[in-house]
Amino acid sequence: MATGTVKWFNAEKGFGFIAQDGGGPDVFVHYSAINATGFRSLEENQVVNFDVTHGEGPQAENVSPA
């Protein structure tokens, strides 16, 4: 499982990007990948744990607060 910091997240559009700790490309995150009940959103500079999968680029899955 990787750790990173939310660069930005647009709650209206339901997606954003996470900067990986230790470098590497930014990781796309969709609201459906956030492990939460109710309204799923992330805050800028929030530290999160996530799994990286690959679609058109790196994508986050199983996102949860660190």
Swiss-Prot record:
InterPro entries linked: Cold_shock_CspA (IPR012156), Cold_shock_domain (IPR050181), CSD (IPR011129), CSD_CS (IPR019844), CSP_DNA-bd (IPR002059), NA-bd_OB-fold (IPR012340)
Q: Name one GO molecular function term.
A: DNA binding
Origin species, per record, is Streptomyces clavuligerus
Query: What are the residue boundaries of the CSD domain, all occurrences included?
Result: 4-63
Of the GO CC terms on this record, one is: cytoplasm
Please state, per the UniProt record, what induces or represses the expression of this protein.
Answer: In response to low temperature.
Q: Which Pfam families match?
A: CSD
Q: What is its main location?
A: cytoplasm
Q: Which UniProt keywords apply?
A: Activator, Cytoplasm, DNA-binding, Stress response, Transcription, Transcription regulation
Compartmental location = Cytoplasm
- Coiled coil ranges (UniProt) are none
SUPFAM superfamilies (alphabetical): Nucleic acid-binding proteins
Transcription regulation found in the keyword field? yes
Q: PANTHER family given for it?
A: COLD SHOCK DOMAIN CONTAINING PROTEINS
Q: Source gene?
A: SC7.0
Name this protein carries in UniProt: Cold shock-like protein 7.0
